[in-house]
Regions:
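Short hydrophobic-acidic sequence motifs that mark active-site Asp/Glu residues
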Residues: 21-23, 81, 141, 179
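Binuclear metal-ion centers of metallo-dependent hydrolases, dominated by the metallo-beta-lactamase
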Residues: 235-257
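Short strand-loop junctions, especially beta-strand C-caps/beta-turns
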Residues: 25-27, 85-87, 183-185, 222
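N-terminal [4Fe-4S]-dependent radical SAM core
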Residues: 1-39, 45-55, 67-77
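Conserved Radical SAM active-site core
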Residues: 40-136
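Conserved AdoMet/S-adenosylmethionine-binding subsite of the radical SAM
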Residues: 92-232
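Amphipathic alpha-helical segments in well-structured domains
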Residues: 58, 100, 202, 235, ...
Length: 257
């Protein structure tokens, strides 16, 4: 069963990577809006979840977030992180930069020790206002599943223009103020082998990671049901092997099995 998240606030949930996380979903509550259509997405395929509701407004997000933070301040739990995630790509929201400003102000008011994180597929980092907003937050988590141009079109299935070289250059512009997040998996999709744990995929990806020089790398594998049922988790051993190669570059890495 794939997951469509409430909007604009959900949780808190316990994140494998981030701790007690209050979710901020800038997409409609009844469907998906994303510039990727990943075959492993827990929210399902884009075509199966076309939203009829509008995007939440900046004002709706701010009001709902403040109400939830006030309640958590009174009744708990204390969040470790406020995470922009949900049903698609958060930076696709036209008021994303302003919503980040609101969120940072509310965080400082209610839970100044909490981090603000954004999980992004990196497709809008070339937009100056999006870039500036991401540069202000604590955890600018950017997806780079592969540097193979053919593989990315089967795994992540970008819905518009997508150039891996442009994405890498955009990530480099953060000058280390980013975290690279990469999905490793196995199995097949429509008869095509999808294993990206081999040297064929890992070594070029690792070169790109070194070029980007992020402050951290997060590698993970499938945790929830995927829309395609022929995909499989990467093994603990495979993830540990990839993690060790990252550590050898001097870049910190976290692994979610």
């Amino acid at each position: 069963m794939t997951v469509i998240y409430p909007s604009p606030i959900f949780g808190p949930v316990h994140s494998r990577r981030l701790g007690v996380s209050l979710g901020i979903n800038l997409l409609p509550a009844d469907g998906k809006v994303c510039t990727f259509d990943c075959i492993y997405c827990e929210c399902g395929f884009n075509a199966d979840h076309r939203p009829k509701q509008p995007l939440p407004t900046r004002e709706e997000v701010r009001s709902a977030l403040e109400a939830r933070l006030w309640d958590m301040q009174q009744n708990g739990p204390t969040p470790d992180v406020l995470t922009f995630a949900g049903n698609g790509e958060p930076t696709a929201h036209p008021r994303f930069p302003e919503i980040i400003e609101d969120t940072l102000a509310l965080r400082d008011k209610y839970f100044p020790n909490a981090k603000v994180s954004v999980l992004s597929n990196s497709t809008f980092i070339h937009r100056p206002a999006v870039f500036e907003a991401l540069n202000k937050i604590d955890n600018n988590i950017l997806k780079l599943d592969t540097v193979d141009e053919e593989y990315v079109r089967v795994l992540d299935r970008p819905t518009g223009h997508y150039s891996i070289r442009e994405i890498i250059e955009g990530m480099k512009a953060f000058k280390g103020n980013c975290i690279i997040q990469t999905m490793f998996l196995k199995g097949s999709y429509k008869g095509q082998d999808m294993d990206n744990t081999s040297d064929k995929f890992v070594l070029p990806w690792l070169e790109a990671v070194k070029e980007i020089a992020p402050r951290q790398v997060m590698i993970y594998t499938i945790d929830r049901e995927t829309p395609d049922h022929d995909l499989q988790k990467a093994t603990r051993e495979e993830l540990d092997c990839i993690a060790e190669r990252i550590r050898e570059t001097g870049i910190p890495v976290s692994v979610s099995y």
